């Protein structure tokens, strides 16, 4: 370590917001270059390379072949798939000296597709799976959590190409199995969850989430063991309500009752329910105006904005991430004052369903109006207390399906503990996690957009079926650090630690240093990776703190006991074991322990 490019820190960096970011910087694995951009130091690269080796072994094992694409990519392929516009501000764009447009790669679907198109033209060439481990770039608005949410990151992405859908599904299952083996070998707990495909497109997708409190993703767990990202969670069909005895809808004056609380208070005072119970938030249909920001498309030469009205139960809250997932790749935000002013039919505090959607388009269905969407929790036949699109007026007993309809049913509200699972196995519970991998069945999205076709067995030209499979390599490293540490520092699994044994000599007696050097030589001769702290002018206390901070699994100390008793202390970094072993046998004991840990 006297020559290792390393500087440990005793204090947490001021802007580090999660444990992994604090410890990886303090232990000398990474250094911050700019927000969301990191420099990898020798110890960090050692761990990163070992993680990549595990990934390569498993992905090569299912027959995939490694390639390497440039990070600087031309605009044209991304225009063909509309992702030049869909990515919006989330990508780094630049021009060369000739004013040609380029981007720093956020993903490489287009390039993989074009490469196969350029080289293959027959079903005889397929199936094939290609992958790379490459740096990606995304212009994160607010980078956070160290390596977990960065603007530059390392990713393994693979793409399968098959002649039919069955082949795509088989490739998907092969990759999925490889992912499970990878995360098991990395000692990283994971949960596969059903997910939305988002801008990637395709018919099916699963995320691999590492459960931890700092995770940005919330996932739902069913008693059956199945799990869903909340964006992909589908509300079980709500049983229709018999409305045959429900009175006709009536308008009633409700002055100055614009909020849910004001509506409840006014109704309980002025219009008591006939069944004797109080009005509650769950009796109210809340109508929320949402702005949908679309990218330019075939019908619009520039980005455009659409307002929609979404009806949800009054005791629920809009979940913008869940709702936005159904509009992907468009982005959503709450309507602004300018939006509302542009539509005088939107009466603040009294917005209801009757002024929008199918019921507002007239008998011939051609009248122009905003789309009206309804949350999946609203049952057919249910009666509601809701706005009448007039100042100071609300509807009572307005029935969904009888009095008003929706253009579409959407998943709009936040899910909560106790909601029924989609598979009907019981109530849901929720955890947070970090996405460490995702697999997609892309189908024909990219092959059709980029005209990737082959001749099949019958001589017919057909589009190629594709799958996409990603692992956030640098994020995986951060997640392992996040879950493998204590209050003293990091504690790496044996197979990816920067070294397998951390040997140190303490004190001033030359005999301790000689014993440490002999141990290093014996371990190295047996193929053991050693980090040797040979620093002469550093106190034992500092050496111990550095060893615990760096996190090598086995620590061997040559010091006073070595000089006096002929023993070397061998301790496990996790604190599970510590013993003094004779200098004559210590090397073999350590070799056996390392080999056992690597089984």
Curated annotation (Swiss-Prot):
It is found in: Cytoplasm. It holds the Pfam family HGTP_anticodon. GO terms for cellular component: cytosol. One of its GO terms (biological process) is prolyl-tRNA aminoacylation. The keyword Signal does not apply. Its main location: cytoplasm. GO terms for molecular function: aminoacyl-tRNA deacylase activity; ATP binding; proline-tRNA ligase activity. Its EC number is 6.1.1.15. It catalyses: tRNA(Pro) + L-proline + ATP = L-prolyl-tRNA(Pro) + AMP + diphosphate. Keywords: Aminoacyl-tRNA synthetase, ATP-binding, Cytoplasm, Ligase, Nucleotide-binding, Protein biosynthesis. Belongs to the class-II aminoacyl-tRNA synthetase family. ProS type 1 subfamily. Homodimer. Consists of three domains: the N-terminal catalytic domain, the editing domain and the C-terminal anticodon-binding domain. Catalyzes the attachment of proline to tRNA(Pro) in a two-step reaction: proline is first activated by ATP to form Pro-AMP and then transferred to the acceptor end of tRNA(Pro). As ProRS can inadvertently accommodate and process non-cognate amino acids such as alanine and cysteine, to avoid such errors it has two additional distinct editing activities against alanine. One activity is designated as 'pretransfer' editing and involves the tRNA(Pro)-independent hydrolysis of activated Ala-AMP. This is Proline--tRNA ligase. It comes from Bifidobacterium animalis subsp. lactis (strain AD011). The lineage of its organism: Bacteria, Bacillati, Actinomycetota, Actinomycetes, Bifidobacteriales. The gene is proS.
